[in-house]
Amino acid sequence: MADELFCKVLSIGIKCRECEDRRANVRLTVESRSSSNPVHKKELVVRLSDDTDPFFLYNLTLGEEDFQSLKNQQGLLVEFSAFPQRFIDLLEQCILEQEKPVPRFLLQLAMSSNALDCMPASLNIIETNPFKHLIHLSLKLLAGSDSDVKKYLATCIKNLKLENCTLKEKLHKSEEDLSKRLGVTQQALAEKCKELDKLRNEWASQTSLLTSKHTQEIGAEREKALQIQTQYQLQYEQQKKELETTSSRTVHHLESRVSELEAVNKDLTERKYKSESCIRELKGKLSGIEEEYHRAKQEVTSLRRENATLDSECHEKEKLINQLKTKTAVLEQEVKDKEHVIIRSVDACESAQEHKKKLEDSLEQKQMQTGKLETTVKSLSEELIKANEIIKKLQTDMKKLMEKIKLKNAVTMQQEKLLGEKEQTLQKEKLELTNVKHLLKIKEEEMLKLKEQLDSTTEKLEESKQQLKTNENVIAWLNKQLNENKIATLQGPHGLHEMPSSLKTVGSASNVGVMQSTQPQFTIGNDPYMVSPITQPIGSAFVSNFYPKNFAPGMSAPSSISLGTRLNPQAAFKANVRFNQSPTALCSPAVEPRPAPSTSTPILPSTSCDPVGLDMKYLKKNGSVPVKGQRNGSSAGTVPVRPALPKSGSSPILSAYFPGQQSRLPAS
């Protein structure tokens, strides 16, 4: 009986002596065969064959006795029972590695070039590494003889015939199954075709009914749509007429609005340019602060680096100190050892001296005894001389040792001095380190302060921007109201009219920003060219100090504000309109005037208590001489006017913007 254990196609490298090496796909089969005549034996059969070349055949039958000789030759550690499985494992490793570019396990078949030679071919299983190619197993296979090839071909033909028979049986069974299935499917197809015809007929009848219904519904819907269309056309024409009338009105309104907006746009552009210049200045300051911040950062990094270098130097010096301490300990130990040696030598000297004394005593005794013992005395004297020489040598050794000890003591003293110096330098460096750390902390605190300053400056910038916006709104509203009131006074025949009763004065003591004349009173003539001195536009710094931030230009004037004029014939040549406010509010140097964009005319920056009012170009009339007002409050500029008596019937008008004060304005 033969059991097939392994049968696979492997890639084997074929090596010939006289031809080139090549690789071929060879089928390797491993079988276990048991024979019972005359003794029950187990044999392992290894066969190499090629599916493309039927005459390529190599066989090996390996019994237990053959395996023992193979085991001894190649130093195998496996028994015959476990050998087939181990051999198959190695073959599986070769199959796994054969597709890699550099395989670890290789199969090699070394054979002679002449097939007629009955030389065995060796099948080698090789493990490759960068150092050496190791042969794990080498099996010698014999080339198949004619009878073996015939037997192999006969078995192959038998196997093919068996496979052919089984395939024919399978084909016959599959044909029968398919024919049965075909019949069933054809019946099902016929039934489905009948159902399809029925469904088509039903669908045609339903479609005809639905088309008739839909045509009726479409006709009705068309009639409804025509009626609705006529209604909508009528409504559309009416709406069109209404829209045309409304659009014409809105167009006129928008044209007037556009003209107003263009004027406002001009004012806003001028304000924009001024605010942009202010922003540039602030950006310059910000860039300077940022540069200082970067410098401080760089200083901090450099100080940190210096700190790191100092730390490393400290560690190195500590290591040196430890090394010197160990050296001193070693030297102390050596000094102790030398002291022990000196003590021993001193003991030896003492013992020698005692021996000398004993010898002297014996000498005296022997001299007293007899002269016969002179020979012995001579020998003893020689021994004494030798002992003295030994003592002298020991004394010289002692002196040398003492000198060495002195040298070592001097060396230790020097090392102690060096250690003291090193400790002093270490303390100095520690002090320097603490100083550097302290400086670093100071720099970090400065950095934090700079950051806080930067944050505060940014907050102030935002606040100033918001304040600018509110100030601009207030200035626009104030200038607009001033212009309207002045133009109204100029256009009237007598220049004076009473304000509504709601705009009466409340009191001048509690209000801030009162407008009053600081110059002497003046008279008004009947000259048509004579006008009242006009105030300059109000600065943004003044408004930001005396008006709240949420003040909007669209708000109505407060009811407590009134506008009035006071006439005085004594001052005929000069007049000046000023805001009456405390000197701390307007003239104090601590209050920093903020730049504000102009409305319709540029605003002169007020460094001191300058008079404020409207610009001259707002007071020009068509075909008339431009109105001249007073420039600054510092010089006594006059407006030449014809002296005239004031009208007796004109009542004083209270100021709408500055409650509690009557404006001293002449009638035109």
Swiss-Prot record:
Spans annotated as Disordered: 623-668
GO annotation (BP), single: centriole replication
Keyword Aminoacyl-tRNA synthetase carried by entry: no
Location in or out of the cell: Cytoplasm, Cytoskeleton, Microtubule organizing center, Centrosome
Domain PISA: 39-91
Keyword set, alphabetical order: Cell cycle, Coiled coil, Cytoplasm, Cytoskeleton
GO cellular component term, pick one: deuterosome
Main subcellular location: cytoplasm
Highest taxon above the source species: Eukaryota
Keyword Acetylation: no
Stretches of the chain forming a coiled coil according to its record: 182-482
Assembly behavior: Nine homodimers form a cartwheel structure with an internal diameter of 23 nM and radial spokes connecting to the microtubule triplets.
Domain description: The 35 nM long coiled-coil domain mediates homodimerization while the globular N-terminus links the dimers at an angle of 40 degrees to form the inner ring.
Annotated function: Central scaffolding component of the centrioles ensuring their 9-fold symmetry. Required for centrosome biogenesis and duplication: required both for mother-centriole-dependent centriole duplication and deuterosome-dependent centriole amplification in multiciliated cells.
Descriptive protein name: Spindle assembly abnormal protein 6 homolog
Source organism of the structure: Xenopus laevis
Gene that this polypeptide is encoded by: sas6
